[in-house]
């Protein structure tokens, strides 16, 4: 088990990391809020244990969770709940470590590139972009994490560019210039004015 290895090699490592990823309905309660409480308790307990067992070496931890489909007996990456769980994970991690980043998985259950992969990855990415995510991962990955597709990777890179544009929002400009900008195109329209062409 991981704990036995950590103890056996504790003098060789400078720091430890304790992640938790229970599956709701299998290794955690099906009710998400209760599952989060369990996941937090596991991470904090593991971090304290490793801090003591490691002789006071630094310990980081990340709290996570995945939805589980009891019909197919698989962790699923394309459900809306997965995007929500990644968002909640980011909030919890930032509570314990204000410098922590927030990552969103572009997950899908699709087995090949196409409509299902596009909308599942797009929903997760949009949630991440609109809620402050600073990292998108699982580029080119399909079937949760079983298949890599170069074609899907190309589509995901384009999606990331689009989501980055969405995340940046409408550019801020100087309100003092608005009247001049409006006046510039009143007679001929705005297609050929300097501000449009710039």
Give the label of every model feature segment.
Residues 1-159:
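Glycine-rich anion/phosphate-binding loop at the beta-strand->alpha-helix junction
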Residues 151-198:
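Catalytic-core signal marking the mid-to-C-terminal active-site face
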